[in-house]
A protein has these predicted regions:
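Hydrophobic helical h-region of N-terminal Sec-dependent signal peptides
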Residues: 9-17
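Compositionally biased intrinsically disordered regions enriched in Thr/Gly
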Residues: 23-285
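Bacterial N-terminal signal peptides that target proteins for export
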Residues: 2-9
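C-terminal motif of bacterial Sec signal peptides marking the signal peptidase cleavage site
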Residues: 18-22
């Protein structure tokens, strides 16, 4: 169980204890894996074609199910492919010490590791309950969000069930600058605590929760005082085709029943609050 807990998304470890006992209904079987297209072709850089494919491993045994799906470039020796394969390894525990030129090999390594850990957890739960009815599940998907000549954005979605009353789901992601594969974090936002920027965030959340006033919005928060100073999400900023996406995982600002509060601030609105580094990434976006 100790190793499995290390995989509950390092960036949201602070809220993981609450999320494990959440009331989120289990998604339809295979949702995370089946929604990943098999082949994607994009024009990147100066009309350079780059084709992405899907690899997946999905095994159901007597103790449960483990699935890993990943989109990556066909050219697995490319800088892009190696960067996202390394990211996948980090999100799944960071123990793989081989080459990142084979996404499939990394997937197989962590799939076998998860199967072993899940079997151990299953045996512990079975002994505690005195029956073998419980079935474990762990599904993760790595997929592309956006891709252009300056950056690409990659996300990690996860659902697991470890024998408790309910399952757990979460989402993380990262935007890479293509020139050097730098990962963008919230350091690219200036003066986020100032009210003009806070209002952009409140506006996005009002739309997500479908409320019209801040008085209504604060009732959606676990801490009503967040209406005065919203924290930035644990999920890094996700650069998309049209703006920067903000994703709050369960229990960051709202109850689990609120889902994952998500909104996108258009580049035209957020640009004044971005560092020069980020502004250069979104030129002509």
């Amino acid at each position: 169980m100790k190793h499995l807990k290390t995989l509950l998304l390092p960036a949201i470890a602070a809220v993981a204890p609450f999320m494990i006992s959440s009331c989120d209904p289990k998604p339809a079987k295979g949702t995370l894996l089946d929604n990943v297209p098999n082949i994607l072709t994009n024009v990147v850089g100066d009309s350079i074609l780059q084709t992405w494919v899907k690899d997946s491993i999905s095994v159901t045994s007597d103790f449960g199910h483990v699935g890993i799906a990943m989109q990556h470039p066909v050219d697995t020796f490319s800088v892009t492919s190696q960067a996202i394969t390394e990211y996948m390894s980090e999100m799944l525990g960071g123990k793989y010490d081989g080459s990142y030129t084979s996404p499939k090999a990394v997937m197989k390594y962590y799939h076998a590791d998860l199967m072993s850990e899940l079997k151990t957890e299953y045996e512990e739960v079975k002994r505690a309950r005195g029956d073998d009815e419980v079935k474990m599940e762990w599904d993760v998907t790595f997929s592309k969000v956006a891709d252009n000549s300056k950056f690409f954005t990659y996300k990690y979605t996860m659902y697991n069930y470890l024998g408790g009353a309910h399952g757990m789901s979460a989402l993380l992601g990262v935007t890479f600058r293509k020139s050097d594969m730098r990962r963008m974090g919230w350091e690219i936002v200036r003066n986020y605590a100032n009210d003009p920027f806070q209002e952009l965030m409140r506006k996005g959340l009002r739309e997500y929760f479908e409320v019209k006033s801040d008085d209504e919005l604060k009732n959606m928060f676990l801490n009503p005082d967040h209406i005065y100073s919203l924290p930035l999400p644990e999920c890094p900023p996700l650069f998309t085709d049209h703006g920067i996406m903000f994703v709050y995982n369960p229990y960051e600002i709202g109850p689990y029943a609120a889902g994952m509060p998500t909104f996108t601030i258009p580049y035209a609105d957020i640009q004044p609050y971005l560092t020069t580094t980020a502004q250069k990434l979104i030129e002509k976006q």
